[in-house]
């Protein structure tokens, strides 16, 4: 596993299709950002998604959380799995329904071939339910090794609008918040942020 030292941008995808789905997503965000080690910078709107693969199951609510952390990616994964367990996550069925699922999509330029933590996420480039909320939260984002999220989203066939293609629908009636530290802009708690300056 390789990657730069110091604080890094982390992209986290959250999903839930059991119980109170919105409350599960919010609880996941709250658990991840409860301490100083993971600082939220933006959270997307909520998207509703038809399940992909696995047994017949309810639709998902999905969102993307952007954060900054100096923790190693493995430690961030541990935090994600702890948050899942707090919401009663069970892993009995592959791609089965779940109260809360949190995936690390990217961690700056870090790469890993570890089967327990592959970075960047090996299927994110084809998942509209990850790309649509990520593009909303950071329109200038790139998925390392795959290119601009905007281009990947176009190929995935999801517009991100209400009734959009690809089984992904933006839920403007639902809202998530992320605790922001003093000095951060409150407008980053939900919805798009300005594209990052990615010049050299």
Per-region residue spans from a language model:
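N-terminal beta1-alpha1 ligand-phosphate binding loop
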Residues: 2-38, 44-48
